Amino acid sequence: MNNNDRLIRLRYALDIKENDMIEMFKLGGIQVTKEEVKKMLVNPDKFEEDEEVDPDSYIIVDNTVLISFLNGLITFKRGKKDSGKNEPPKVEEPLKNSLSINNEMLKKVKIALSLTSDDLLDIFYDVDVDISKSELSALLRKEGHRNYKVCLDRYARNFLKGLALHFRD
């Protein structure tokens, strides 16, 4: 699963409109146009091998762009942090391990939607994924912690599918 796919699935699950996505990117520290958002919502992996594809018809979303969007989602859903300073949002450093993007997505969506660990367990349960509290805790830990566990695409896909079931009813 690539970042374009994650963005597409998250947008569907939370029923986010394009204008709201532009605002979320802005809150996350990245300026994008409506056309750029549309190009980000194209998954380049879905094209057939023999199909001629114009490289200008899509934009590959990297980890930094996805993390900025998720930070903007948090700010959009929960409001700005009261730090007393009026600073522009800073773009986070890229992840050391590209596999941990699923962990970051899980953590940031949990924060944005004010979900508890029990809510996450319910979401996974609704899509028939058996995950214990300790496994979930390991997925939510900081990379480098001794009990940290990489969130595989299977968990990320099912989490986004469960979110869609919860929020699109």
Segments from the language model and where they lie:
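Short, amphipathic alpha-helical "recognition" segments used to contact nucleic acids or chromatin
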Residues: M1-L14, S100-A112
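Non-catalytic, well-ordered alpha-helical scaffold segments
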Residues: N63-I67, N103, D118, D153, ...
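Extracellular/lumenal glycan-associated surfaces
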Residues: Y12-F25, S68-K77, S117-I123, N158-F167
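A cross-kingdom feature marking solvent-exposed beta-strand/loop segments within repeated
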Residues: M1-I8, I16-D62, D122-I123, V129-A156
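Flavin-dependent oxidoreductase catalytic cores
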Residues: V91, N103-V109, S117, R141-Y148
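Intrinsic disorder/low-complexity detector
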Residues: D62-N102, L163, D169
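Positively charged, low-complexity terminal tracts
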Residues: P94-L95, L99, N103, F124-Y125, ...
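Short, well-ordered coil↔helix boundary/capping segments
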Residues: S100-N103, I111-L115, D130, K149-R154
